[in-house]
Amino acid sequence: MLERLSGHTRLTALLAAPARHSLSPKMHNAAYAKLGLDYAYLAFEVDNSGLAAAVQGMRALGICGANVSMPNKQAIVPLLDELSPAAALAGAVNTVVNTDGKGHLVGHITDGTGAIRSLAEEGVAIKDQIITIAGAGGAGTAIAVQLGLDGAKEIRLFNRKTATFKQAKQVLKGINAKTSALASLQDLADDRAFRRSIAESSIYIDATGVGMKPLEEHSLITDPALIRPDLVVFDLVYHPAETKLLAFAREHGAKKVMNGLGMLLYQGAEAFKLMTGEDMPVAYIRELLCRNKE
């Protein structure tokens, strides 16, 4: 990498805490090298207490873009100059672009785009579909927003009645006001409503994190009656590659089961495009990530 650095090298970054575990530097730097782009991507350990200074640093240093992860996705919103339609609806940002190099910072959210591109790659269309999502955290609500913007018929979000539930209610209010989709939020503890929603949906998305450590032996769906051959089962967890949910769905006849690796790739590819104007070599990066897991 050192031989690629010059006085013209442009900097992109990750602002998160923790940041050191992230796959983003590996993905972006590998893509820069593959395409011969004079960019470098660094991870910075930044929480809410240092976020305003970090954003001001982006302006002062001409950093051309940054990914934003926990705990900064919502806290960064008032520090920016402009939001994309999806970010405005979600009330959260995971990508910031310094559009003119002079400090005009625009916030985007690419999680939803990543999920929908991953579905499209598997031949799954979302237009005019009824979709159930379990989990109303950042990923779940971002996906709900993009589903609404891209023409889903109904989006049924389920979550426990925590602080996240109240925040999600505001996001869904915006989806109903700004898109043609009918978006609703229900208590995940209401098993009857949850089962009925899955039965009426063509796509089930699990955005809860159940299935990854330390809950790798758990699944929200344990009744084979909920699994149909035509139900798409999409678990955002990508490690392990096959969660308890996906194994159960496959065993009981679901023909289309998907993990979150494609979403990880495509949300990163969307951020890469926003920051550089170039298309990320997705197939190359997918192979790199798969090798890294072995």
Curated annotation (Swiss-Prot):
CDD domains: NAD_bind_Shikimate_DH (cd01065)
InterPro entries: Aminoacid_DH-like_N_sf, NAD(P)-bd_dom_sf, SDH_C, Shikimate_DH-bd_N, Shikimate_DH_fam
Residue positions of the active site: K73
GO annotation terms (biological process): amino acid biosynthetic process; aromatic amino acid family biosynthetic process; chorismate biosynthetic process; shikimate metabolic process
Pfam families the record matches: SDH_C, Shikimate_dh_N
GO MF term set: shikimate 3-dehydrogenase (NADP+) activity
Residues that coordinate or bind NADP(+): G135, A136, G137, G138, A139, L236, G260
Signal peptide residue numbers: none
Protein name per the record: Shikimate dehydrogenase (NADP(+))
Organism per entry: Streptococcus equi subsp. zooepidemicus (strain MGCS10565)
Record lineage: Bacteria, Bacillati, Bacillota, Bacilli, Lactobacillales
Gene: aroE
